[in-house]
Design a protein with these regions (language model features):
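Mature exported/compartmentalized surface modules and terminal targeting/interaction regions
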Residues: 2-11, 31
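Cell wall/extracellular polymer interaction/catalysis modules
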Residues: 31-104, 112-126
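Exported/periplasmic cell-wall-interacting domains
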Residues: 2, 6, 47, 99, ...
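N-terminal hydrophobic or amphipathic segments with adjacent small-residue motifs
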Residues: 18, 61, 72, 81, ...
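Bacterial N-terminal signal peptides
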Residues: 10-29
């Protein structure tokens, strides 16, 4: 995909060079660029069709592309006092090795990596007066394995599972959270 993206950028740049582009078009040398640009769109198209479905009652998150279910993983969700929000959302941003800030023990500490409370992958999906909600890894796999309702509203996944989901979706991927 990176190669296709580079080729496409090269193909788009010559538009500012109209005489060269016209000569290339007449000579037929532009066709490979057009084919590469189409190939990139074909490769990227399925990602736009992807959506994430979180079923709170099953405590399961599923990646769907078109009508095909690509993966399903157990999750821990928000505690009843701080529930995971329901509704239609989209992935707002994606972070590798996000920083988790804690003030426990009276001092500010920054934690990151798979042993931090949010693991080594984080995808934000909603912001409101309570803060930001995300799908992330965890340092406590037990809560995910028993599909507990223990978080402050975020969705916790096993670190290996969030990495799979993280790599399969883009920012703006749709997220449906339902009961």
């Amino acid at each position: 995909m990176n190669t296709l993206r580079l080729v496409s950028l090269v193909c788009l740049m010559p538009w500012s060079l109209a005489p060269v582009m016209l000569a290339g078009l007449l000579a037929g040398s532009v066709l490979p660029c057009l084919a590469a640009e189409s190939a990139e769109l074909a490769v990227r198209q399925p990602a736009r069709e992807s959506r994430i479905v979180l079923d709170l009652s099953k405590r399961q998150i599923t990646l769907v592309r078109g009508e095909q279910r690509l993966g399903a993983w157990p999750v821990a969700i928000g505690d009843p006092k701080t529930p995971t929000p329901k509704g239609e959302f989209a992935i707002l941003n994606k972070k590798v090795n996000p920083i988790y800030v804690t003030h426990k023990s009276g001092q500010r500490r920054e934690l990151r990596g798979p042993s931090s409370p949010i693991g080594d992958r984080y995808m934000a999906f909603h912001r409101n007066g309570r803060g930001e909600f995300g799908i992330h890894g965890t340092a406590w796999p037990h809560w995910v394995q028993i599909r507990a309702a223990v978080s402050l509203g975020c969705v916790r996944m096993l670190n290996s599972h969030i990495r799979q989901l993280f790599d399969a979706v883009d920012v703006e991927t749709r997220l449906e959270i339902r009961s």
